[in-house]
Amino acid sequence: MVGYFPPLVEQVRQVGLPLTVVELDERWLQQDGQFEVTLEPEKLNDCSKIICTGTVLVNQTIDGLLPCFRNASQIFIVGPTVGCLPDPLFDRGITRLGGCSVLDTVQFLGLWTAQEKWRASTRRYVLSRDSTYPGCSQLLNNATRGLNN
């Protein structure tokens, strides 16, 4: 995993699966049996599944991490900061993106401004490289056809 995401870390630990988390913030560093939080991305080389928080897109660390994902069959980037077209990421080997879209803007802004949890005002989604996602080019073609009709 890239990025210490406490709710997800707890879910994985409760199941008892081995988990390595790469983090930039030293205050999260720890090791306990099959669980480790490290500063060393190379420790992901042997992982078969990788989950990254969307922060890897925001802080532009994804390119430096990709070589460490080469043995992973599944690579996910998840979180509210993943609202982007997936094509360039799919082309680089990312298999799924999970994000959220705002359903109720007024409710969302009220909750966000009050620094409260805003999940109730959003809907989660997953885009998969192997799904029916048509690709950016096809989306643009469809939009252009719609404008010309």
PLM features: residue spans?
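Short, polar loop motifs at secondary-structure junctions
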Residues: Y4-P7, V22-W28, P80-C84
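Short, conserved loop/helix-junction motifs that constitute active-site signature segments
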Residues: V12, L44-N45, P67-A72
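A short helix->loop->beta-strand "cap" motif at the edges of active sites that frequently abuts
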Residues: L17, R70-Q74, I94
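Structural motif
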Residues: K49-T53, F76
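C-terminal functional extensions of proteins
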Residues: F76-N149
